[in-house]
Amino acid sequence: MNVGVKVREISTGSIGVIEKGNNQNGFFVNFGSRKNWKRNNEVEVIQNTIDNSNGKQSTTPKPIAQQQQQQQPPPQQSQQQPPQPLKPIPATRPVPTIPKVQSEDPGPRFGNFTLPTTNSSTKYSTLPSRQFFEVSSSPGDENGTFKRSAAPPPPSSLSSNQNGSNLNKVQSPSRPSIPSFEPPTQQPTQPLQKSPRNVPIVPKRTNPSPPSPPLQSPQPTPQQQPPPLKPIPQPQQQQQQQQQQQQQQQQQQQQQQQQQQQQQQPPPLKPIPQPQQSQPTQPIKSQIQIPITNTNGNTNGHSSLVEKSPRNNESTATTATTKDMWNIDYKELKFVGNEIGSGKYGSVSLGYWLGTPVAIKKLHENNEETEILVQRELQILKEIRHPQIVQFLGVSRNEKDEIHIITEFMDGGDLFDALIFGDIPLTWKEKLRISLDIAQSCRFLHARGILHRDLKSQNILLSTNRRAKLCDLGLARMFEERINKRYTCVGTEIWMAPEVCLDQSYSTAVDVFSFGIVLVEIITEKIPDERFPQHRFQFDAPAFLKKVPKECPPDFSKLCVDCTKYNPKERPSFIKVLDTIQNIYDSLPDDDEENYD
């Protein structure tokens, strides 16, 4: 190897210059971005920058591999077979790289990148040699690449030529030789001619030949023709098939359910033959049934009590039985004694219905207003079932078309008579128990969107064990608090809330105010004071506190004042009322008499 020889690395195409070094070989290749070549790689000499015309040879020490190669005798070659020349390397023009000055790094580098180093070697200078600058400044072609050297001579002349201008292969002394990376020569392939079915593919001839007629594929006979393939079902067809299968399954299930229902259903009764009438007659009022529906609105006229059944095979007798569920035959009622009470819309009498004691409420008038109230009360009572609300049993009409409402009988009378005219006074434990029953019934109604609007002591009935139940829901109505509406002034003025008397919009707070007036009756055992419009029907709390007995629990009287506040938003809800009364009731000692809890 000569110093200053320009070489190319075969594997990467990088251009470098051989320079003198202090390593084992005595020289190294400077590629600009790195020094020395990769291990087990080969370089190609492409230009010698030193003029050897005077016959002077470089005194650069040769690598050990090259010395061993010179000492060994040349291999014996056959005289009959001349040496084959080397194939030229494909004309690939390497891209010139800008040399960079850096310290020697004998280790391998991949990708032509370097790492910054701070310590420089003290063996020799880190500046590039003169030969490197001559190679980097040598002129190139128009594209800026170096000119390619002439083709290398045959291998026989490699041993005689020592100037480094021919191709030299330098191998690492410690590693075996690497096979040549030259791409193999490929002969141009010729396109194959497409052949018809059942005919082997034959390549075209290279020699020129006269044009031959095109090959014709043999027509298959009917016996040789393959059977037609079934069309692959498309996704839409699969979906349609699945839908059809699902529909068939649903139809089968429906048929099975119908068969089971027919087996379980008893045979229909034959309708009783009715005598034919020549002319239609109008129904008698006593035979008209009061409509009771599950809707919130009022029904006028003589509509059906129950909606039509979805079954088409339902008998007439079954439908008539369903319609008569809330209608009681007047002949089944038996009145006992005189009236036991009266109200604004009717009087109450004691009676028996099929041997059961009941309360029969007879309405005074039978007009449109009464009809609306009856329908409203029946609609509400029919859907309400609560231990602290009087149970509704049905409705009946007599021959005079008088409406009678039948409910359960409460043998203790109403709360007003027990407080004002009662012979046996109520203990504070019983008063709190009655107040708790009233609050529970009102809480139940409000949870279902129902206002009573006429809560007073006359509409609270007692049993013999001093338990209270709420009755007379004729003025109750369904409400929706989100709708700010003005309602008509109804109820009794002493127990009515100020917003109802002033014809303002109201909500559940009106029942809380009426409950507070009932607490005034329970605490004082007197009729509440009248409220006047000049004071905007406001409750006089100081006057009430003067009438409170000393035995009354303080929290009980305070709850009464809170429930009767003028501002509806300041009144407590029935949930809080229940908690307060329950705490007061638990704090009191038990009565000496029998505990009816």
Curated annotation (Swiss-Prot):
One Gene Ontology cellular component term attached to this UniProt record is: cytoplasm
- Kindly state which keywords UniProt assigns to this record, in alphabetical order: ATP-binding, Kinase, Nucleotide-binding, Serine/threonine-protein kinase, Transferase
Task: Provide ranges: composition bias, Polar residues.
Answer: 49-61, 114-140
Biased composition of type Low complexity is found at 157-168, 235-264, 275-301
Which residue intervals define the domain Protein kinase in the entry?
A: 334-585
Has UniProt tagged this entry with the keyword Nucleotide-binding? yes
SMART domains for this protein: S_TKc
EC number(s): the record gives: 2.7.11.1
Summarize where ATP binds, as residue positions: I340, G341, S342, G343, K344, Y345, G346, S347, V348, K361
Which residue intervals make up region (Disordered)? Answer: 49-320
What's one GO MF term for it? protein serine kinase activity
Q: Which domain of life is it from?
A: Eukaryota
* Chemical reaction(s) catalysed: L-seryl-[protein] + ATP = O-phospho-L-seryl-[protein] + ADP + H(+); L-threonyl-[protein] + ATP = O-phospho-L-threonyl-[protein] + ADP + H(+)
Spans of biased composition, class Pro residues? 72-97, 208-234, 265-274
User: What family does this belong to?
Assistant: Belongs to the protein kinase superfamily. TKL Ser/Thr protein kinase family.
- What is the protein named? Probable serine/threonine-protein kinase DDB_G0281745
